[in-house]
């Protein structure tokens, strides 16, 4: 497995090992613990042999029929990244001291891997990794054979998971047909199914992200009034987004709630600047924040920058809110 992986990377494969958020739930399905999944050697071994199986099946599919008219088959396609997107990512990465080389596709892959390796264990790891993945082209399914850029494979398909992915089931059906000397399947019909599968994959990924976000907010709602270390993950004219480093959950500090100064947004430097203090807060800065609110249904987390004034005012308001809630619940019990 290690030899297979080494061979892939020599050919220009890119390693995108994201930090996957997981939860432990109680008997009422409420999150009682949030943790980052650790990929072990056993996971990587299985992954490499699944990649090998998928590649070999794709190679077999591409060998069916005559060179000028191959039999219909389903491939997993990943195109080269858009150069404009790469340049924008380079500007983003430069804020953290990283750089991507553009001389060739192998140079891009090599510098991407070097960047991702150097991020390991750093506060900005999740932020930069996520942005790097968004820079890449979206993989999709199709009947026209094309390379898989991210894996550096000339032929690739999805074959190993027919119980959870419809394209794998399509591949199994095509294999069964061709192994029994069947004629080529209708290409237009399979191309349409590939487009539908690609569209549904995007929807499924969106739903998964939303569900993780929901549980993150639900979990963070138990930490109202507590302080956390974070990293500035976005800057806008209405506020700054901060990723809570411990839980990989993003919240917002609104400019209207920043009481120490009046801040102006500088789009060029992706920062906000205090008019009186000239204090600058920019993308990638490490800061300490206080959780002030969490709305599960809107999936939003409200934060405030930590200073003594903010803490005093928040704690005073929070104590009043707790007393109001206790008084309200007492009235309900008496009824």
Spans of model-derived segments:
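Short nucleic-acid-contacting surface segments enriched for D/E, G, S/T with interspersed K/R
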Residues: 223-226, 262-289
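C-terminal edge strands of extracellular/lumenal beta-sandwich accessory domains
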Residues: 310-314
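Electropositive polyanion-binding surfaces
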Residues: 1-259, 284, 290, 295, ...
């Amino acid at each position: 497995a290690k030899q297979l992986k080494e061979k892939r990377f020599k050919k220009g494969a890119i390693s995108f090992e994201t930090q996957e958020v997981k939860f432990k739930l109680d008997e009422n399905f409420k999150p009682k613990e949030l943790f980052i999944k650790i990929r072990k050697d056993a996971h990587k071994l299985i992954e490499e042999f699944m990649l090998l199986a998928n590649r070999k099946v794709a190679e077999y599919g591409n060998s069916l029929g005559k060179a000028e008219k191959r039999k219909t088959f389903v491939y997993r396609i990943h195109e080269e990244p858009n150069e404009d997107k790469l340049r924008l990512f380079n500007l983003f990465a430069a804020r953290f001291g990283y750089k991507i080389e553009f001389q060739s596709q192998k140079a891009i892959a090599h510098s991407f891997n070097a960047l991702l390796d150097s991020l390991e264990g750093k506060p900005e790891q999740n932020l930069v990794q996520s942005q790097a993945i968004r820079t890449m082209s979206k993989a999709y399914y199709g009947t026209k054979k094309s390379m898989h850029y991210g894996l550096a494979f000339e032929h690739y398909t999805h074959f190993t998971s027919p119980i959870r992915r419809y394209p794998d089931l399509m591949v199994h059906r095509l294999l069964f047909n061709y192994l029994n000397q069947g004629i080529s399947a209708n290409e237009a019909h399979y191309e349409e199914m590939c487009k539908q599968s690609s569209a549904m994959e995007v929807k499924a990924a969106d739903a998964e992200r939303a569900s993780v976000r929901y549980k993150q907010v639900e979990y963070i709602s138990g930490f109202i009034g507590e302080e956390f270390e974070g990293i500035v993950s976005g800057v806008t004219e209405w506020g700054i987004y901060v990723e809570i480093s411990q839980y990989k959950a993003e919240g917002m500090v609104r400019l209207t709630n920043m009481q120490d100064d009046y801040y102006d947004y500088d789009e060029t430097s992706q920062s906000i600047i205090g008019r009186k203090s000239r204090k600058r807060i920019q993308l990638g800065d490490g800061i300490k924040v206080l959780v002030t609110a969490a709305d599960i249904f809107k999936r939003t987390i409200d934060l405030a920058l930590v200073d003594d004034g903010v803490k005093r005012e928040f704690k005073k308001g929070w104590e009043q809110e707790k007393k109001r809630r206790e008084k309200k619940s007492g009235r309900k019990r008496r009824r």
